[in-house]
Amino acid sequence: MSKWKDVKKVVLAYSGGLDTSIILKWLQTELGAEVVTFTADLGQGEELEPARKKAEMLGIKEIFIEDVREEFVRDFVFPMFRANAVYEGVYLLGTSIARPLISKHLIDIAKKTGADAIAHGATGKGNDQVRFELSAYALNPDIKIIAPWRDWSFKSRTQLLEFAEQHQIPVAKDKKGEAPFSVDANLLHSSSEGKVLEDPSQEAPEYVHMRTISPETAPDKATIIKIGFEKGDAVSINGERLSPATLLAKLNDYGRDNGIGRLDLVENRFVGMKSRGVYETPGGTILLAAHRAIESITLDRGAAHLKDELMPRYAELIYYGFWFSPEREMLQAAIDHSQRHVEGEVTLKLYKGNVMVIGRESAKSLYSDKLVTFEDDQGAYDQKDAAGFIKLNALRLRTLAARDRK
């Protein structure tokens, strides 16, 4: 293609799945470019070795598979959870938060290998194309970015399958013997889209769920756990200090075994259309509940309410791909400042898809049983003071009412 005629070497974000395997071959045959593959170990597990073998089979000499799990949780997931970020009220941004990290490594590898461009397998209809490219341009304004879904002649996954067969590219099959759902997975979540899920009126088949058992089949006995926090980040489970990635993985196990973290969502994509996805975020769902609980006793009301007002904008920035933007960093600075005293321990009961907070304690707690007690507070609070407080706050309301009565 003439627009890429000067590109000699490309770093491809490679999962080993259908789209990126075909993109790899397409870059070789249509552009004549040397391809370097980068696969991020974000906690997706068995996807990694097949990706290496496919890349080797397709003649790739430079294959980068990097374990970025600790970096992912420490530098991306945990900062996001300090904000209690959810998009459109429910989505914990599991796919969104991984994209800037992948772009960061693509840019680093391009510099290391002398590549002219980077490439990704995001479609021209989705959010990921925006997330990958905004992040990449923020880190290297001169980088060339190839997005084959916007350039090639393929219009459907059926055509991709035909191309794969023509070039003897192996494609994974799901339990139905068909091409698999469009799947994204990392240590925070998994998502499934496409096929029967494109009809939002139909319940997702049980076999779509990869990370959790059904709440109906979860144990009849509740699981009790304690999560410890320091400066807004989870640092321990049941008193055992763990690294960020290890801690999230352990929460995933608790969530999986108790049917926690399933979400069937129709969301508003950045490009303007609505899409339906099935998400599983077992550990993240537990972590969010615990973090909000420890904040409830350690954050001042004004700070907590302002933080809640900022959260939708912060979540939207991540969803839209503006992780490396100045406005996200400004919000992060404010959020991180609010977390200085967010420490302590939260006790949770996990039962059949539910996360219930049953206890919270902190050396920095603002909760005072002497103030709120229904018993004798020994003069800690004079209830007569409330009368003046109420009169002052009622002044404008009484003035309005008097005017309207005329």
UniProtKB/Swiss-Prot annotation:
GO CC field: cytoplasm
Binding site for ATP: A13, Y14, S15, G16, G17, L18, D19, T20, S21, A40, G121
Keywords: Amino-acid biosynthesis, Arginine biosynthesis, ATP-binding, Cytoplasm, Ligase, Nucleotide-binding
GO molecular function per UniProt: argininosuccinate synthase activity; ATP binding
Residue intervals passing through the bilayer: none
Positions annotated to bind L-citrulline: Y91, S96, N127, R131, S182, S191, E267, Y279
Pathway listed: Amino-acid biosynthesis; L-arginine biosynthesis; L-arginine from L-ornithine and carbamoyl phosphate: step 2/3
Homology family: Belongs to the argininosuccinate synthase family. Type 1 subfamily.
Assembly notes: Homotetramer.
Protein name stated in the entry: Argininosuccinate synthase
Protein species of origin: Brucella canis (strain ATCC 23365 / NCTC 10854 / RM-666)
Lineage summary: Bacteria, Pseudomonadati, Pseudomonadota, Alphaproteobacteria, Hyphomicrobiales
Gene: argG
